Swiss-Prot record:
Entries under Pfam families matching the protein: K-box, SRF-TF
Record organism: Arabidopsis thaliana (Mouse-ear cress)
Gene name of the record: AGL21
Keyword vocabulary terms for this entry: DNA-binding, Nucleus, Transcription, Transcription regulation
Domain MADS-box: 3-57
Name of protein: Agamous-like MADS-box protein AGL21
GO molecular function, one term: RNA polymerase II transcription regulatory region sequence-specific DNA binding
Subcellular location: Nucleus
Domain K-box residue range list: 86-176
Residue ranges that the Swiss-Prot or TrEMBL entry lists as coiled coil: none
Top-level taxon of the source organism: Eukaryota
Protein's job: Probable transcription factor.
Predominant location category: nucleus
Subunit: Interacts with AGL15, AGL16 and AGL19. Interacts with SIEL.
């Protein structure tokens, strides 16, 4: 059998009412936390017990949630009333003009202008702001310089490696040229030797042939011819 339907009505017994309140309060706060995390929602929860005790939860801060709530309510009311909407935007424009004027004045003061009306405390505050700005500028400058140094170091290492590779290639080409020169020299030397041997052989054969072709001399002299 399924569970019976719970009747939603005030619990008369104070003890049971307190136990139920504690359980439901914890469950409600847990659900609010889950909603804020899962849905990236800004959640604000305010609970007052029957005894007047406050329980609350806010995903960011309760003040920011309430301020946002009040601003949204005002905007909704003004959207429903055109005249109120015009006044709302006029107030917004006035606030923005004041903020712009304050920023411009602060900028001029940080540039060293319009300092006559400032008190000692205001000047000290301005000096602190300038020092903070200078520290931020120096930190950013050091960061950029460090990055540039790292980039230059990387480029230097790359160039050094390229020079080493080129030097190895030049040495290898030089060695190959030396080997080719040696091979060509040996080939030429062997060619000259073969030609000299061939010429010597030809000369020897020629001398032998010349010697063989000469007439043989008789052991007896040719008799003189008779006088006619």
């Amino acid at each position: 059998m399924g569970r019976g339907k719970i009747v939603i009505q005030r619990i008369d017994d104070s003890t049971s009412r307190q136990v139920t309140f504690s359980k439901r309060r914890k469950g409600l706060i847990k659900k609010a936390k889950e909603l804020a995390i899962l849905c990236d929602a800004e959640v604000g929860l305010i609970i007052f017990s029957s005894t007047g005790k406050l329980y609350d939860f806010a995903s960011s801060s309760m003040k920011s949630v309430i301020d946002r709530y009040n601003k949204s309510k005002i905007e909704q009311q003004q959207l429903l009333n055109p005249a109120s909407e015009v006044k709302f935007w006029q107030r917004e424009a006035a606030v923005l003009r004041q903020e712009l004027h304050a920023l411009q004045e602060n900028h001029r003061q940080m540039m060293g202008e319009q300092l006559n009306g400032l008190s000692v405390n205001e000047l000290n505050s301005l000096e602190n702001q300038i020092e903070i700005s200078l520290r931020g500028i120096r930190m950013r400058k050091e960061q950029l310089l460090t990055q540039e140094i790292q980039e230059l170091s990387q480029k230097r290492n790359l160039i050094h490696q390229e020079n080493l590779d080129l030097s190895r290639k030049v040495q290898r080409i030089h060695q190959e040229n030396v080997e080719l020169y040696k091979k060509a020299y040996m080939a030429n030397t062997n060619g000259f030797t073969h030609r000299e041997v061939a010429v010597a052989d030809d000369e020897s054969h020629t001398q032998i042939r010349l010697q063989l072709s000469q007439p043989e001399h008789s052991d007896y002299d040719t008799p003189p011819r008779a006088n006619e």
